Curated annotation (Swiss-Prot):
Annotated GO MF terms: 2 iron, 2 sulfur cluster binding; 4 iron, 4 sulfur cluster binding; biotin synthase activity; iron ion binding
Top enzyme category: transferase
The keyword Transmembrane appears for this protein: no
Cofactor(s) recorded in Swiss-Prot or TrEMBL: [4Fe-4S] cluster; [2Fe-2S] cluster
Domain Radical SAM core: 48-278
Binding site for [2Fe-2S] cluster: 143, 203
UniProtKB keywords: 2Fe-2S, 4Fe-4S, Biotin biosynthesis, Iron, Iron-sulfur, Metal-binding, S-adenosyl-L-methionine, Transferase
Lineage: Bacteria, Pseudomonadati, Thermodesulfobacteriota, Desulfuromonadia, Desulfuromonadales
Cofactor mode of binding and number, as noted: Binds 1 [4Fe-4S] cluster. The cluster is coordinated with 3 cysteines and an exchangeable S-adenosyl-L-methionine.
Catalytic activity, reaction form: (4R,5S)-dethiobiotin + (sulfur carrier)-SH + 2 reduced [2Fe-2S]-[ferredoxin] + 2 S-adenosyl-L-methionine = (sulfur carrier)-H + biotin + 2 5'-deoxyadenosine + 2 L-methionine + 2 oxidized [2Fe-2S]-[ferredoxin]
Quaternary context: Homodimer.
Species this protein is from: Pelobacter propionicus (strain DSM 2379 / NBRC 103807 / OttBd1)
Protein name, UniProt field: Biotin synthase
Length: 328
């Protein structure tokens, strides 16, 4: 296994593309071989993306009563949870939170809303006005996560100042029906394609620990590679009481790190950011995400769960000898 890991890493650094079968074999690493896998993933990261980390923050700008039935989501109307329910916050609140995110060291700021998608009207106007102000009043790069989107709306948001559009596939095509039946996987794929046609950067990844196999995690890397997304958020399930997956087990820290490492081998030049579930799944090994190939993380709170203080994340990066890079 040791020689196979080293050979795969060398090939990736030289520009080769690994296949799913090779990734599955890498995922068999255990013990000292697993530590070598992490080290080589970190070498690939430094070769392609350098030794700085991108930091992003989000605002839950509209919460709850989502018509989708995603098994993991506290905001789904199909679940009974303690998640807050409120309409779209006003422009002032969106801009205020952008300033707070910038002050806390984030370089990217996501406006996230619950629901299947957004249509022309007052909500879209509020978001566009907020984007214009964020671009003129701060140096932070704004992104949006508004659900399923068409090309025309993507262009409107881009013209208002949106730099990146975030839309997760959540999991592989083969496992998706086990997680969500309220829309089709192809609608998510078409959203990514529409955003790319509009000339907007794409942030697209998923969530792990839903019951998928490791092979299905690798399957998603192939879809992400085919779509040529720009950055990939990696989330780890933090089970919420009242959701369909409330009794799911947390992934072990080493399982999370192995997933990050395999994603770095498969998507060597992409920004890989660890987001939701970092604290609860990785626990004392949070700093290892970068030693396993990640190149960024979300800082501050998540949509419906708490994160940790931004100062702790900055100290972690300083302890690792890493700087903070731009939005990637």
């Amino acid at each position: 296994m040791r020689s196979f890991i080293l050979a795969c890493a060398d090939r990736v650094v030289e520009g080769a593309t690994l296949g799913a079968e090779e990734a599955l074999r890498l995922a068999e690493a255990r013990g000292a071989d697993l530590h070598l896998l992490f080290a080589e993933a970190s070498r690939i990261r430094q070769h392609f993306t350098g030794n700085s980390a991108s930091l992003c923050s989000i605002i839950n700008a509209k919460s709850g009563r989502c018509a989708e039935n995603c098994a993991f989501c506290a905001q789904s109307a199909a679940h009974k949870t303690d998640a807050q329910v409120y309409p779209l916050v006003d422009e002032e609140e969106i801009v205020r939170c952008a300033r707070d995110a910038e002050r806390n060291g984030a370089r990217c700021y996501g406006i996230v809303t619950s629901g299947t998608g957004i249509r022309p009207g007052a909500e879209l106007e509020t978001i566009c006005n907020s984007l214009r102000r964020i671009r003129s009043e701060t140096a932070i790069a704004p992104s949006c996560s508004l659900g399923i989107l068409d090309e025309e709306t993507a262009r409107l948001l881009k013209d208002a100042g949106m730099v990146t559009y975030h839309h997760n596939l959540e999991t592989s095509r083969s496992f998706f029906p086990s997680i969500c039946s309220s829309h089709d996987y192809e609608q998510d794929v078409e959203t990514i394609r529409a955003v790319k046609r509009a000339g907007v950067r794409v942030c697209c990844g998923g969530i792990f620990g839903l019951g998928e196999s490791f092979g299905q995690r690798i399957e998603m890397t192939e879809t992400l590679r085919e779509l040529d997304v720009d950055s990939v958020p990696l989330n780890f399930l933090n089970p919420v009481e009242g959701t369909r997956l409330e009794k799911a087990d947390f992934l072990t820290p080493l399982e999370c790190l192995k997933t990050i490492a395999i994603y770095r081998f498969m998507l060597p030049g992409k920004s890989l950011s660890v987001c939701g579930g970092r604290e609860t799944n990785l626990r004392e090994l949070q700093s290892w995400i970068f030693l396993a190939g990640a190149s960024g993380m979300m800082t501050g709170n998540y949509l419906t769960t708490l994160g940790r203080k931004p100062e702790q994340d900055h100290q972690m990066l300083a302890d690792l000898g890493m700087g903070v890079g731009g939005c990637s």
